[in-house]
């Protein structure tokens, strides 16, 4: 991935000259490429998911599951070949930067389209979502009915998704909240890739946004509750971009700072109303980031402080205007005890690489976590540790590195605080959920270390390439982009297949049990799902 790839940089940009400013494209010219980029990711994600719904297998039999996984891979490869050919043609005869952006966005959609398509295969023959009417799935279906009939729901649960589900069900699947949740879940899984990719495009060039943003989707996003994890994946880059805007507010007018802050306030409020849990775990880290950032701004003088205060104040005002009522209810209910003990509460709290939740499957009968090679630490975690160190070495001053590092530290502190008091208080307080944030921040820092190293290498090689002809420079860039896209597609195909396989129906207390319950729960009309074992359910 060449550090010179097209896209926004995370380093401070030089202010353009008046001649360059006059030559800027129109507003439509600036927005159109981004719109094409976003649309390509969304269309590929939804289109590939739809194609996968035509895979005809019995997901309750292992041979059917294997055939389904193979059919998914076959479609993925064919779709990627088509996308690669379109990218190559567009790069040769149209705009290479736009072609790269479109290809990266399309691959982000293809990656999570594979995930969503696999879940669709696992749920073939039943109207129920993962976990049927159990747990959170059943609660959301109950709330759907409550909302449509004008009854109140939980005052502390984030309200945006339940209300969206209710409107979605009422519009498309009236009287069938289970089917509505199933279909909306598939759409959300499919759109997770493009959403995360576009969030990281606020900071990074296309290929790096694709790698750092979409790779963590597979180990973090749980198909039974995709609406939860997507907020975490989007929140970190948005917070990093917000921090960057605070630092750059010096060169803006007060009016621009106010409008920018209002936009951030609205975005953060919507994420908060969608799922607030990640704001809680990220709060200590972001408080530290704000202290460091505002200290930098203060050293730039009163003018910088004024504009930063305008941006920060507008952000807070709009956030409170949109989400203030829910925030007040959440704070009022913050003393609600969580006593639910499950598998991960008995695991070494220093381990975060894989979160099993309350569905460990056969792992519950063996040693977990698996013993690592170096002092009990495995190779994967060692790579994350090296990445954290390298990112801090090369980019400690960068907002994205600071946000990821401080949020990781803050999540660790809260995790250890609650775990250390668990015996005394007999409370869990959801601390194992910090595993996802710790893993995500570790992957982000590893990815940023690779990005910064590539930039450092590209800078050293810059003199030689600058003296080369345009054609000599362009050919390796095209080859490099193709190589990276192929490598990432290979990873997405393998990770997607493995993740989907974990959700294939299995009555083993594993993640496969979510689909198993969907196939063994009677349908609303009292009949059994098509592939219920021996036609029996209940």
Question: Where are these predicted regions, by residue range?
Answer:
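Start-transfer (signal-anchor) and selected internal transmembrane alpha helices
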Residues: 1-122
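Active-site lumenal/periplasmic loops and adjacent helix-entry segments of GT-C-fold
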Residues: 118-233
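Transmembrane catalytic cores of multi-pass membrane glycosyltransferases
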Residues: 136, 227, 277-283, 287, ...
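Hydrophobic, aromatic-rich transmembrane alpha-helices
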Residues: 375-401
């Amino acid at each position: 991935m060449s550090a010179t790839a097209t896209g926004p940089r995370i380093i401070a940009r030089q202010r353009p000259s008046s001649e360059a400013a006059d030559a800027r494209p129109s507003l439509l010219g600036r927005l159109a490429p981004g719109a094409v980029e976003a649309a390509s990711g969304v269309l590929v994600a939804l289109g590939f998911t739809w194609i996968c719904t035509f895979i005809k297998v019995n997901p309750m039999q292992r041979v059917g599951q294997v055939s389904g996984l193979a059919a998914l891979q076959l479609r993925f490869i064919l779709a990627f070949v088509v996308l690669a050919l379109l990218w190559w043609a567009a790069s040769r005869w149209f705009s290479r930067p736009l072609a790269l952006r479109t290809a990266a966005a399309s691959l982000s959609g293809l990656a999570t389209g594979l995930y969503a398509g696999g879940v669709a295969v696992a749920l073939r023959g039943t109207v129920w979502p993962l976990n049927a009417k159990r747990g959170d799935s059943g609660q959301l279906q109950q709330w759907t009915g409550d909302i449509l009939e004008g009854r109140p729901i939980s005052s502390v649960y984030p309200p945006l998704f339940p209300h969206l589900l209710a409107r979605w069900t009422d519009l498309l699947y009236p009287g069938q909240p289970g089917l509505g949740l199933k279909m909306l879940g598939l759409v959300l899984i499919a759109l997770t890739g493009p959403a995360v990719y576009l969030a990281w495009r606020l900071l990074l060039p296309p290929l790096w946004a694709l790698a750092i943003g979409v790779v963590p989707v597979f180990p973090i996003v749980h198909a039974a509750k995709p609406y939860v994890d997507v907020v975490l994946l989007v929140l970190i880059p948005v917070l990093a971009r917000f921090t960057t805007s605070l630092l750059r507010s010096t060169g803006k007018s007060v009016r621009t700072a106010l409008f920018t802050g209002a936009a951030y306030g609205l975005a953060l409020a919507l994420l908060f109303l969608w799922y607030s849990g990640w704001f809680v775990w990220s709060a200590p880290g972001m408080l530290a980031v704000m202290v460091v950032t505002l200290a930098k701004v203060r050293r730039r003088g009163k003018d910088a402080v004024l504009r930063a205060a305008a941006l920060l104040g507008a952000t807070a005002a709009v956030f409170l205007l949109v989400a203030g009522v829910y925030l007040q209810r959440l704070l009022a209910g913050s003393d609600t005890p969580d006593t639910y003990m499950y598998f991960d509460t008995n695991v070494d709290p220093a381990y975060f690489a894989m979160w099993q939740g309350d569905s460990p499957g056969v792992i519950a009968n063996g040693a977990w976590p698996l013993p690592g090679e170096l002092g009990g630490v495995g190779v994967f975690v060692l790579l994350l540790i090296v990445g954290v160190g390298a990112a801090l070495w090369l980019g400690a001053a960068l907002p994205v590195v600071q946000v990821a590092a401080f949020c990781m530290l803050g999540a660790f502190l809260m995790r250890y605080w609650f775990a250390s008091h668990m015996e005394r208080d007999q409370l869990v307080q959801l601390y194992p959920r910090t595993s996802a944030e710790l893993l995500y921040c570790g992957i982000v820092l590893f990815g940023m270390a690779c990005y910064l190293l590539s930039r450092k290498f590209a800078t050293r090689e810059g003199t030689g390439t600058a003296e080369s002809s345009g054609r000599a420079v362009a050919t390796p860039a095209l080859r490099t982009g193709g190589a990276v896209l192929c490598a990432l597609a290979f990873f997405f195909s393998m990770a997607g297949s493995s993740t989907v396989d974990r959700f294939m129906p299995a009555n083993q207390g594993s993640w496969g049990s979510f689909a198993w319950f969907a196939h063994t729960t009677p349908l609303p009309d009292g009949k059994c799902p098509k592939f219920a074992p021996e036609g029996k359910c209940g």
